[in-house]
Swiss-Prot record:
GO terms for biological process: translation. It comes from Halothermothrix orenii (strain H 168 / OCM 544 / DSM 9562). PANTHER family: 50S/60S RIBOSOMAL PROTEIN L14/L23 (PTHR11761), LARGE RIBOSOMAL SUBUNIT PROTEIN UL14M (PTHR11761:SF3). GO terms for molecular function: large ribosomal subunit rRNA binding; structural constituent of ribosome. InterPro entries: Ribosomal_uL14 (IPR000218), Ribosomal_uL14_bac-type (IPR005745), Ribosomal_uL14_CS (IPR019972), Ribosomal_uL14_sf (IPR036853). It holds the Pfam family Ribosomal_L14. The keyword Ribosomal protein applies. This is Large ribosomal subunit protein uL14. Belongs to the universal ribosomal protein uL14 family. It comes from the Bacteria.
Length: 122
């Protein structure tokens, strides 16, 4: 459950380390983002010589949340941290590697490139 001002770790190799959510995309009244939702964020922490710089405004897709997500079969999935992957205008990941597990819900939202790069899909 990500909202404005939430901080997320970055799960790719773009050079960003931490993001601050500015806006949840998907309608004027959409308040929270879950797994597979797109957010607009700013880079709060970045490594030197990375693809993105500190202060840059980026789009990202949420891949892990601490708040549990209910699945159609009645089970729940939750992670130890909130994490996102930076994406471009065509919803493809900007990085070439994904770190850590990602949720299966990304497959239903058609983020196939992220699914294929991820080391584990839960």
């Amino acid at each position: 459950m990500i909202q404005a001002e939430s901080r997320l770790r970055v799960a790719d190799n773009t050079g960003a380390r931490e993001l601050l959510c500015i806006r949840v995309l998907g309608g004027s009244r959409k308040r929270y983002a879950g797994v597979g939702d797109i957010i607009v964020a700013t880079v709060k922490e970045a490594i030197p010589d990375g693809m993105v710089k500190k202060g840059e405004v980026v789009k990202a897709v949420v891949v892990r949340t601490k708040k549990e997500t209910r699945r159609p079969d009645g089970s729940y999935i939750k992670f130890d941290e909130n994490a996102a992957v930076l994406i471009d205008k065509a919803n493809n990941p900007r990085g070439t590697r994904i770190f850590g597990p990602v949720a299966r819900e990304l497959r239903e939202k058609n983020f196939m490139k992220i699914i294929s790069l991820a080391p584990e899909v839960l």
